[in-house]
Swiss-Prot record:
This is Extracellular lipase. The active site is at residue 568. Belongs to the AB hydrolase superfamily. Lipase family. Residues 385-405 have a biased composition (Basic and acidic residues). Its EC number is 3.1.1.3. Optimum temperature is 37 degrees Celsius. Retains 90% of its activity after 30 minutes at 55 degrees Celsius. It is an enzyme of class 3 (hydrolase). The keyword Coiled coil does not apply.
Length: 684
């Protein structure tokens, strides 16, 4: 019998086809866990959501929101950018292969991904909004999950999934390699003897009914169904910044991290907690059909509290009555699409996309200006834009080569070019928002770090010949995880492990394969809510140290304009930018202090470097979980005195700058600093 899989809300892909010997081709012993009880049950699920408010619920949570698991339980849904793992339970020697592109061209596809409408009162799907298209909206790829080799699969969304929404998927079992699990079959076919069983039976009936209405596929062909909601990290960021604004407005002298986190945890929940139900205020629309910007009044509160510090006047210099659009950004995923020529599309974002703006600014530079940049392609900011703006057919060709070529080409394409694919302009994304002028002469070259950190350093190093007046823009790629390039990047690197061990003297702060939580910032800082609380603390720590002539003089005349956008999954990776030097020769155009830029070193050093921030040590100390291990707390306590001395640099890089990086030009630059994290939606 042909069988299908449905996932509602973000989805997971079902797997068509078996591997192994000829004797195993007809095997039907493989199945999917449903009740989230086994190691194979790794996908988001409606079963992990509270019935009364839709927030996530984890069995190990407590009432203390400084507990990371408990803080994560305040989330309204799963990331809009993450790939969904599907790990079948298989017998030894049996593999379940991903469906092929050809199978998706059949009249009945092996997998369906659907976006569903969500009833915020009943907290469950109420209909199907859209059946998403394979190769356009999502792809199915092999996963490196530690299961039977070749069995694990992942559904990789190409644009971000819709925020504050639900999704579903369905797959067809063309070779009968997957069957319904016994738990799913029991709940589906039996009404149940208690309230829990009856509720699950009703959910399965609802999910399969909606799928049949949208596709015409009968429920007896469905072997699995589930749904879950999504939440954008950008929505949460707006809420957290709003909390910071309210705290600082009430007490403009100091920003107490503990007070901020308490306010955020109890009074500034994201998404529907900000606006119960579906009746949200009318907000500024995103261009190109993107979702409306949430919490407009929160943005106003932020602007009122922080003035030009958060809103760079050069970036957003418009009358208050004129809407400032938020543009779209295509994230750079870890894996390229598994379909030749498939390219990610702009994803819904709720914060302005710096790459898009800089790209469009560079597009406005004339050919003579490009020649004036010197050195030809890649030698200056305009050449930098040229290097990023490859024709679609060439980029598609590289994408095919990256997916289907040999291992060396895959590594080269994924590591060296993936970040360039993301820099595609979105329609009506605020062209000219950043213009070449005395302060930003030729646009803003970008420094990347993240999953392609080492390759980005190598590639950008060839294009970093900046002239005075060019302002580097530090961008963090969405969903970076480090260690993706031969296991060398991120906090999982050996250099990072050594740095953290020296820092705290405890292995509890070191990320290993057995202990990934330090990398996720979940073991030592109260930043579980999408790591956003720490990003706000980092932002203001940077503002304090950069706000000349008087530290902490936020928004005062002559203070440095710092525009912080987003967050970084790793600890304090965003502000890898600079030391600072006072410069009292303020121009009429508003150029702030002179800034000396340091080439971003190895990503793993940024977390340790943040601890050297004067005035930031207490914040780190406060962030140590009260429930953390004794040696972890002792390690930070011993290191705390190192955080109180006034350093010459905002962040002192532990990795020396490599030769040939053109620092002499950037050292003479007089421009504002923009500290940027991921500008897409999701968990980073």
């Amino acid at each position: 019998m042909k069988k299908k899989l449905i996932y509602a809300a973000v989805v997971s892909a079902l797997l068509a086809g078996c591997g192994g010997s000829d004797d195993n081709k007809g095997d039907t012993s493989s199945y999917l866990d449903y009740l989230l009880t086994g190691s194979n049950a790794v996908g988001p699920s409606a079963l992990a959501a509270r019935a009364w408010d839709g927030t996530l619920k984890f069995s190990t949570e407590t009432a203390d929101l400084s507990n990371p698991v408990s803080a994560m339980s305040t989330l309204d849904g799963w990331s809009t950018t993450q790939a969904i793992q599907i790990v079948p339970v298989t017998s030894s020697g049996i593999t379940v292969q991903a469906p092929t592109t050809a199978e998706f061209g059949a009249s009945v596809a092996p997998l369906y991904l659907l976006e569903v409408t969500f009833d915020s009162t009943a907290l469950r799907p109420s209909g199907v909004k859209k059946v998403l298209t394979y190769g356009v909206d999502f792809v199915v790829a092999a996963s490196a999950w530690q299961a039977e080799p070749g069995s694990a699969q992942a559904v990789e969304p190409l644009p971000c999934l819709a925020n504050d929404s639900g999704h579903r998927t369905a797959e067809r079992q063309s070779r009968r390699c997957l069957k319904a699990g016994s738990d799913y079959g029991n709940y589906k076919n039996n009404a149940g003897s208690n309230a829990q069983e009856q509720t699950i039976n009703g959910l399965i009936a609802l999910q399969e009914g909606l799928f049949k209405a949208a596709t015409g596929i009968a429920t007896d062909h469905v072997i699995f169904s589930d749904w879950f909601g999504t939440q954008s990290g950008a929505d949460v960021l707006v809420a957290v910044k709003g909390a910071a604004a309210s705290v600082l407005k009430a007490d403009p002298v100091t920003l107490d991290a503990a007070k901020l986190w308490k306010q955020d945890a109890w009074e500034h929940q994201p998404a529907r907690h900000l606006y119960p139900g579906r009746d949200r205020p009318t907000c500024l629309p995103d261009p190109a059909g993107c979702r409306a910007v949430p919490a407009a009044e929160q943005k106003d509160a932020i602007a009122t509290a922080f003035g030009p510090v958060l809103r760079s006047t050069r970036l957003l210099k418009r009358p208050r009555s004129i809407p400032v659009p938020s543009s779209c950004l295509t994230s750079s995923p870890h894996r390229r699409p598994q379909v030749p020529g498939a390219r990610p599309r702009p994803s819904p974002g709720t914060v302005p996309s710096q790459p898009v703006r800089h790209r469009q600014c560079a597009e406005g530079v004339t050919r003579s200006d490009r020649r004036a940049g010197g050195g030809g392609r890649g030698s200056g900011p305009a050449g930098d834009a040229d290097c990023r703006s490859d024709p679609p057919e060439r980029a598609a060709g590289r994408g095919e080569q990256a997916d289907w070529g040999d291992a060396h080409l895959r590594r080269q394409a994924a590591g060296r070019r993936a970040e360039h694919w993301s820099l595609q302009p979105a329609a009506d994304a605020g062209r000219g928002a950043i213009r070449a002028d005395a302060c930003l002469r030729q646009g803003c070259p970008q420094h990347h770090h993240g999953c392609h950190h080492l390759s980005a350093r190598r590639d950008l190093g060839q294009r970093e010949r900046l002239r005075p007046g060019a302002g580097p823009d530090l961008e963090d790629l969405c969903r970076h995880a480090g260690g993706q390039e031969g296991g060398a990047g991120g906090d999982r690197s050996s250099a990072a492990r050594r740095a953290w061990l020296r820092l705290s003297g405890s292995m509890d702060t070191v990320t290993t394969s057995d202990n990934p939580t330090p990398y996720l910032n979940l073991s030592y800082l109260t930043v579980a809510r999408d790591n956003l609380k720490q990003s706000v603390a980092i932002c203001w720590a940077c503002v304090w140290r950069l706000a000349w002539p008087t530290p902490r003089a936020i928004g005062t005349a002559g203070s440095l304009k710092v525009h912080f956008l987003g967050h970084s999954l790793g600890a304090s990776r965003v502000p890898t930018c600079c030391g600072r030097q006072p410069d009292h020769r303020q121009r009429a155009s508003g150029c702030p202090v002179q800034v000396r830029y340091r080439w971003p070193g190895h990503a793993g050093s940024h977390s340790a470097a943040a601890a050297e921030l004067a005035d930031f040590g207490p914040t780190i100390k406060m962030g140590v979980l009260t429930s953390g291990s004794a040696e972890l707390k002792a390690g930070f306590t011993a290191y705390a005195p190192n955080c109180t001395d006034g350093g010459a640099y905002l962040l002192r890089q532990r990795v020396p700058a490599e030769p040939g990086r053109g620092h002499s030009a950037t050292a003479a630059t007089r421009c504002r600093v923009q500290l940027c994290g991921p500008v897409g939606a999701g968990f980073g």
